[in-house]
Amino acid sequence: MAVNVNTNVSAMTAQRYLTSATNAQQSSMERLSSGYKINSAKDDAAGLQISNRLNVQSRGLGVAVRNANDGISMAQTAEGAMKETTNILQRMRDLSLQSANGSNSKADRVAIQEEITALNDELNRVAETTSFGGNKLLNGTFATKSFQIGADNGEAVMLNIKDMRSDNALMGGKTYQAANGKDKNWGVEAGKTDLTITLKDKREGDVTISINAKEGDDIEELATYINGQTDMIKASVDEEGKLQLFTDNNRIDGAATFGGALAGELGIGAAQDVTVDTLDVTTVGGAQESVAIVDAALKYVDSHRAELGAFQNRFNHAINNLDNINENVNASKSRIKDTDFAKETTALTKAQILSQASSSVLAQAKQAPNSALALLG
């Protein structure tokens, strides 16, 4: 082996391995201290891109869960207020039935009407003041809003909260008053027993109801017979013996038309719009009509409460799914980006040993040219 002074190949080789070991040691220390095996694009360019996309998705899923929880909270707030609306309407119905009883005097009914009016004011106050995050929920201004429950655009769900004010048309219906009252001595005449009611059901379309009363039926029996034949229209009789008919705006679209001999004899009038806001229980007829109006309002409120309950259940399932997706996304990201401490500590130990060995060899290699001095000696 030649003895060289100008070029120390052994030292150069030792220096190269020392540099490599030092770089490996620094890389291992960076991975262990940060907890990530990918700290820059040079570590793994493809892995960095994939892990960043997964991180974006994970953060989006986290926001979606928060959005869904906000949606549940909003629906719970609205539904909770609507529960009180239901309680108010039930009390109104009780009072209407009480007022319809013959044992009450005019003064009694006026007193009952005062409570009806107070309850109506409270129902509207609930509708006007129920809010969530500054958004009024029940006064008709909320309309429809979207809730982003996904990590990407286009993954929104619409929520509609309806108007719960007492003057809302869907909190009532249409009433029809007969012009001709009938006393207890009146009875359905032979050949004049037919009554036809034509209306448009929102679910079934145009419907014609044929009522064939029995000869001799009085006005109360006629009302009972009508109620027994269909649930699309409610019949009652006021204190003057006049037939009253009511259709629910939630089910019937537009006004009903009446035909047949009985329609002409009774003189059934044109439709009048009525809502909870117009309840008047100061008469027997008004009290009877109020029961039908409140029943329609209760159906409307309860139906929307059911919709909000379904919305909450849907969002609960959405949150469960989002949490599951987020868990799997983070597991994938962890496998790509996170440091395997067992593996990396082994690599660090190896790099430290090689670094120390290379340093020792380099020190010895630097002494090799000194042997040339012995030859000159």
UniProtKB/Swiss-Prot annotation:
This is Flagellin C. Keywords: Bacterial flagellum, Coiled coil, Secreted. PANTHER family: FLAGELLIN (PTHR42792:SF2). Belongs to the bacterial flagellin family. Flagellin is the subunit protein which polymerizes to form the filaments of bacterial flagella. FlaC is not essential for flagellar synthesis and motility. GO terms for molecular function: structural molecule activity. It is found in: Secreted; Bacterial flagellum. The lineage of its organism: Bacteria, Pseudomonadati, Pseudomonadota, Gammaproteobacteria, Vibrionales. It comes from the Bacteria. GO terms for cellular component: bacterial-type flagellum; extracellular region. It holds the Pfam family Flagellin_IN. Residues 103-129, 301-340 form a coiled coil. V.cholerae is able to differentially regulate the flagellins within the flagellum maybe to produce flagella which are particularly suited for motility within a given environment. Heteromer of multiple flagellin subunits including FlaA, FlaB, FlaC, FlaD and FlaE.
